[in-house]
UniProtKB/Swiss-Prot annotation:
It catalyses: (2R)-3-phosphoglycerate + ATP = (2R)-3-phospho-glyceroyl phosphate + ADP. Its EC number is 2.7.2.3. PROSITE patterns: PGLYCERATE_KINASE. This is Phosphoglycerate kinase, cytosolic. Monomer. It comes from Leishmania mexicana. The gene is PGKB. ADP binds at G214, A215, K220, G238, A311, N335, F341, E342, D374, T375.
Length: 417
């Protein structure tokens, strides 16, 4: 999939236009404070482009998973339909104001914002409240999603999509609005995301390594199946590695294992061999008897995990082996951590992979792509994110791209003639 044949924000006049931009400001908030503003910062180039060209921005996003209310529900005496304090975009408006160094107005109800929109002048920014406060945003009933899309579309002259993180959703704000307006344009973040993934999937510098981790093989079946026809090396870590290792007859102690996926693991390993893909699995492990942080976890001498122990991270020999493979590759794509990186004593494997990719990018020109979600969080936590070619803002969307699927939020955008 590529954005080469889709129109972008550079292909349309923005002066004096009210531009409705679907962004992904689904950021972590604790006690009313944003703990990671990466997604907000990633949307700035598109917002600044509109302002520079003399347009005004109407921003819409979701945050969290509020229960939501229907458009037809009675309006409460105070407040707005579906409102939940934990999911308000108020902290986002404050942070965006700081980043833009100008006031960002906020409409408290995304579907009753006409008065706020009418006051917009050149260079103004308006943030609508959480679109998921209305259940129509994610409704599977086309008429419900269309009803919400029509209200939002009425605010604007143009629709721009910069929400790669929700591009895999067929929703009112991702596909409904461009359908109503008859056009939709890609923002700079959307364009950047798709083009990086397109490059690594369709025409990567070789050798190409896929580093795949996380808890379950079942979560990565389609990704692995699609990538085996494209990669030279497959590096496996995380809890999912132990399903593969048990399938090979190794001892895994009480490590997590999907017993019903052992035959699938064998099949994937056989397919990799048939396609000439070298698969690397852990050769030593950092273990504990319980799923908790300890000061001195057990590090095994070899590939087998002792009885009564569970593997929580890859060991030093495995780290060295994985670093060597990354070092000999020209492209690397990483989806899923190597272990429980949130616990400092068992974060070394994940952080070592991040360091190897960052170093390879800066010193040897490695094309390095981080596939969003937990992997992006790990790269940020390891302070290596800035060294990568690209850190995706989308977990589910990047996973579906790697699985070879078409993203509805991209497919709906206007084709170039």
């Amino acid at each position: 999939m590529s954005l080469v044949l889709k129109k972008s924000i550079d292909d349309v006049a923005l002066k004096d236009k009210k531009v409705l931009i679907r962004v992904d400001f689904n950021v972590p908030v604790k006690n009313g404070e944003i703990t990671n503003d990466f997604r907000i910062r990633s949307a700035l180039p598109t917002i600044q482009k509109v302002l520079k060209e003399g347009g005004s921005c109407i921003l819409m996003s979701h945050l969290g998973r509020p229960k939501g209310a229907r458009m037809s529900d009675p309006k409460p005496e105070k407040g707005v339909r579906g409102y939940e304090e934990a999911a308000t975009l108020r902290p986002v408006a404050a942070r965006l104001s700081e980043l833009l160094e100008e006031k960002v107005a906020k409409a408290p109800d995304c579907l009753n914002a006409s008065i706020y929109v009418s006051k917009l002048k050149r260079g103004d920014v308006l943030l609508l409240e959480n679109v998921r406060f209305y259940t129509e945003e994610g409704s599977k009933k086309e008429e419900e999603a269309d009803a919400m899309a029509k209200v939002l579309a009425s605010y604007a002259d143009l629709y721009v999509s910069d929400a790669f993180g929700t591009a895999h959703r067929d929703s009112a704000t991702m596909t409904g609005i461009p359908k109503v307006l008859g056009s939709g344009y890609a923002g700079y973040l959307m364009e950047k995301e798709i083009n990086y993934f397109s490059r690594v999937l369709n025409n990567p510098p070789r050798p190409l390594v896929a580093i795949v981790g996380g808890a379950k093989v079942s979560d990565k079946i389609e990704l692995l199946d699609n990538m085996l026809g494209r990669i030279n090396y497959l590096v496996i870590g995380g809890a999912m590695a132990y399903t593969f290792q048990k399938a090979q007859g190794r001892k895994i102690g009480i490590s997590m294992c999907e017993e019903d996926k052992l035959d699938l693991a064998k099949s994937l390993l056989k397919k990799a061999q048939e396609r000439g893909v070298q698969v690397l699995l852990p050769v030593d492990h950092v273990c504990n008897k319980e799923f908790k942080a300890v000061d001195s976890p057990l590090v095994t001498e070899d590939v087998d995990v002792p009885d009564g122990y569970m593997a929580l991270d890859i060991g030093p020999k495995t780290i060295h082996m994985y670093e060597e493979v990354i070092g000999r590759c020209k492209s690397a794509i990483w989806n899923g951590p190597m272990g429980v990186f949130e616990m400092p004593c068992i974060s070394k494997g994940t952080f070592a992979v991040a360091k190897a990719m960052g170093t390879g990018t800066q010193k040897d020109g490695l094309l390095s792509i981080i596939g969003g979600g937990d992997t992006a969080s790990a790269a940020e936590l390891s302070a290596r994110a800035k060294n990568m070619s690209h850190v995706s803002t989308g977990g589910g969307a990047s996973l579906e791209l790697l699985e070879g699927k078409t993203l509805p939020g991209v497919a709906i955008l206007t084709d170039k003639q």
